[in-house]
Design a protein with these regions (language model features):
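All-alpha effector-binding/dimerization core of bacterial HTH-type transcriptional repressors
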Residues: 1-138
């Protein structure tokens, strides 16, 4: 678990509707899920800079519970994109795989009950541990 404050990319600035020229920083939460022998996903979450996060929150607790209990932010909607690519050195090191191994990338765009963007989350999944299931009804 690693918490920092970083200037977001232009794509993330657009999502949060912030001016990239102002140098606004977002709180960034990075964590790897799985265990030491088999890490299967690396998450990087950027949070709306209008949320007064300090980085001292207890992120061992459920994230959306922290947002609701401490900041009265109720998460309602998420939209997702899934794509594939090779891991590259940075992600390969986190997931204990080769840089040439395939990974799946899931971008999740999270909104509160008022459709205010709350979290921009990127998940990098080992391709050998990810199944994406969709159910549709007419």
């Amino acid at each position: 678990l690693h918490v920092s404050f970083k200037k977001p990319s232009e794509e993330i600035c657009t999502f949060f509707n912030i001016d990239p020229e102002k140098g606004t920083k977002c709180m960034v939460l990075e964590r790897v899920r799985g265990n030491k022998e088999y890490p299967f996903v690396s998450f990087i979450s950027y949070f709306n800079p209008n949320i007064p996060l300090t980085g001292d929150e207890d992120f061992t607790q459920p994230l959306y519970g922290v947002l609701e209990n401490k900041y009265n932010i109720i998460v309602k909607t998420s939209k997702e994109e899934v794509s594939a690519r090779l891991a590259g050195e940075f992600i390969a090191e986190k997931l204990d795989i080769k840089s040439s191994d395939p990974i799946l990338i899931r971008k999740r765009f999270v909104y509160d009950i008022n459709q205010v963007p709350i979290e921009y989350n990127i998940g990098y999944y080992r391709a050998d541990s990810f199944t994406y299931t969709i159910e549709a009804e007419r």
